[in-house]
């Protein structure tokens, strides 16, 4: 089924967008209380469906661990309008759910390091979270991903100096491969960092890539 805005709360959507079946399997010993969690991956979701549980399952029997980088929260927003407050809360959850090794664009699909979010969402994130160290790391990764002459030759093209739209760039995705909103992050993100924090060192680090 397609995702429908009118879908009822609690309705689990199981369709695989890319026809990739992802499954965590755990065989219980059956000798007492057991706990398990994935060790090499994480999953984004809104609802969890449990099938085959013997007896009555209560919410306190399932623990959901929320994962994100440790960016300290220093900004808040609150009004007398509960709708605006709710929108702010939903937005904040969307932001924090994508703060990992890179700034991903969704926590439930491919979890790639799309770099356009690093500048398009910079102010929205920096107003609420201290992202100085985290964003420095992302800028370093963006600069480090630029193709040098040897890498361009190995790729069979003449794209020396090209900055991929995702980091690490292990494959290309259609028309986004050469879009300034994505590839231009090597310019826009360091500039946004400098404008917000006044750190010239970030500009000096990124300048050889920009040039």
Predicted regions and their residues:
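Short, intrinsically disordered, charge-balanced linker/junction segments flanking boundaries
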Residues: 4-10, 195, 199-200, 208-211
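HEAT/HEAT-like alpha-solenoid repeats
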Residues: 143-147, 195
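Extracellular/oxidizing-compartment recognition motifs
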Residues: 1, 11-108, 116-117, 131-136, ...
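Alpha-helical hydrophobic/aromatic positions enriched in membrane-embedded helices and signal peptides
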Residues: 2-3, 191
């Amino acid at each position: 089924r397609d995702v429908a805005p009118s879908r009822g709360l609690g309705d689990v959507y199981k369709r695989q967008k890319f026809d990739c079946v992802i499954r965590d399997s755990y065989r219980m010993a059956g000798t007492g209380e057991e706990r398990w969690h994935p060790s090499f991956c994480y999953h984004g979701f809104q609802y969890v469906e449990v099938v085959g549980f013997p007896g009555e399952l209560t919410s306190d029997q399932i623990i959901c661990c929320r994962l994100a980088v440790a960016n300290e929260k220093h900004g808040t927003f609150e009004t007398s309008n509960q709708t605006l407050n709710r929108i702010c809360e939903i937005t904040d959850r969307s932001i924090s759910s994508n703060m990992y090794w890179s700034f991903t664009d969704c926590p439930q699909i491919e979890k790639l390091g799309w770099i356009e979010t690093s500048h398009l969402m910079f102010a929205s994130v920096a107003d609420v979270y201290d992202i100085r160290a985290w964003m420095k790391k992302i800028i370093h990764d963006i600069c480090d991903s630029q193709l040098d002459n040897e890498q361009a030759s190995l790729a069979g093209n003449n794209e020396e100096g090209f900055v991929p739209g995702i980091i690490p760039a292990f494959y290309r995705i259609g028309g986004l491969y050469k879009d300034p909103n994505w590839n231009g992050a090597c310019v826009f993100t360091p500039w946004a960092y400098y404008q917000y924090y006044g750190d010239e060192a970030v500009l000096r680090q990124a300048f050889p890539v920009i040039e």
